[in-house]
Design a protein with these regions (language model features):
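Conserved phosphate/ATP/ADP-binding segment of small-molecule kinases
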Residues: 171-263
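Hydrophobic beta-strand scaffold residues
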Residues: 41, 68, 161-163, 194
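Conserved N-terminal subdomain of the carbohydrate kinase-like
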Residues: 41-134, 329-341
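Alpha-helix C-terminal capping segments
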Residues: 22, 29-42, 63, 292-295
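Charged helix-capping and loop-helix junction motifs
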Residues: 116, 144-149, 175-184
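Positively charged, low-complexity intrinsically disordered leader regions
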Residues: 1-12
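Conserved post-catalytic alpha-helical subdomain immediately downstream of the catalytic base
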Residues: 250, 266-335, 339
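Short pre-catalytic strand/loop immediately N-terminal to key active-site residues, enriched for Gly-Thr
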Residues: 14-24, 228, 266-280
Length: 341
């Protein structure tokens, strides 16, 4: 877990003097859809003993209806451990968002499997699903091993595993071969595998369409071919998903998704969504998809809920969706933005 500092009113970071701070992580952002809709969610993470930022993060997770578990490390002095900071503005109009990560001394790099009683979590507590992000898997050699061991233990207990590849070039630099092996094994163990066109190419070596660009709706066949290759490479995985995004302007995107399960394909054709802050939209999609899977909905319904949950997250300043209820999410899918009284 870390924090995000965001300038108010859509201003650039470098010329702002007023900021909002929020607690954030890819995994907790995904879990927020389920926690706000009443499912129990626990976050496994690390804290800094006595840190007011750790207290801020714990209080935020509690406000999201989540529990948490993890070791508390001594800071080790003023140059020691702390929580990472994302310096991220929202962009506005024709000026795109910019993100800089300050990860010096990040306590999350210290995570190890033996800091948790995984048999209790997956056995006695009966966790049905564990979601892993490639951000943590690539953070350090220790966290790579942590994610591997968590996935292996979950598989041994019959717990479903979700893995969002979340490639970040800065974390992979100099560790490409090592991380490719780690990500391959986690993907092999996973029941749900998520990534965009760049993630699948850079993390797993599977060819796909060129990243980004215009005309995303006309590239759907290329995305399906890419997912087809991923399915061949990972035959034990049950669900494969990718999002489709074309940026018209900072505040207007074409947003779509593709989900494949078994022989079935569920394509949410890109359509316009309004965007207040784009960061967390992909996590919102995954969170909505997993909520539908946990509710044992038909896959088409779960995929639609994922699309709408991602669109919801894009309307919020937080990195995560905070649905009031299922009806609010479905109204987004249906394109109904009328006032509800």
């Amino acid at each position: 877990m870390g924090t995000r500092l965001t300038p108010v009113n859509g201003q650039p970071f470098h010329c702002s003097d007023t900021f909002k701070m929020q607690a954030t992580s890819a995994e907790s952002n995904v879990g927020a859809v389920s926690s706000y809709l009443g499912l129990p969610v626990k976050v496994l993470t690390a804290f800094v003993k006595g840190s007011p930022v750790s207290r801020f993060i714990k209080d935020n997770l509690a406000s999201r209806h989540m529990t948490f578990e993890g070791p508390e490390f001594d800071a080790g002095g003023p140059w020691g451990l702390r929580h990472q900071i994302n310096l991220a503005d929202s962009g506005a109009g024709s000026r795109g968002p910019r993100v800089a990560n300050d990860r010096a001394g990040e306590v999350g790099r210290m995570l190890a499997a033996d800091q948790f009683d995984l048999d209790r979590i997956f056995g006695e507590e009966g966790a049905q699903f564990i979601h892993l992000s490639g951000l943590i898997a690539a953070l350090s050699p220790e966290t790579s091993q942590f994610c591997l061991e968590v996935a292996r233990k979950a598989k041994a207990h019959g717990t479903c595993i979700g893995f969002d590849l979340n490639h970040r070039a800065s974390l992979w630099e100099g560790r490409e071969e090592e991380l490719r092996q780690v990500f391959h094994e986690i993907a092999t163990l996973s029941d749900v595998l998520v990534g965009n066109e760049e993630d699948f190419q850079l993390c797993l070596g599977i060819d796909g369409p060129p990243p980004g660009g215009e005309g995303i709706a006309g590239k759907i066949d290329g995305f399906k071919e890419m997912i087809g290759r991923v399915k061949q490479a990972y035959p034990s995985t049950s669900v494969f998903a990718t999002t489709l995004r074309e940026v018209v302007s900072v505040n207007l995107h074409q947003w779509g998704a593709i989900v494949s399960a078994g022989d079935d394909w569920h394509v949410m054709e890109p359509r316009e969504i309004g965007v207040l802050d784009r960061i967390g939209g992909g996590d919102g999609f995954v969170g909505g998809l997993l909520y539908g899977i946990l509710r044992e909905w038909p896959m088409e319904k779960a995929a639609q809920f994922g699309w709408a949950s991602g669109a919801l997250a894009a309307t919020l300043l937080t990195d995560y969706g905070q649905p009031a209820d299922e009806d609010q999410v479905w109204s987004i899918w249906e394109g109904n933005a009328r006032v509800k009284r």
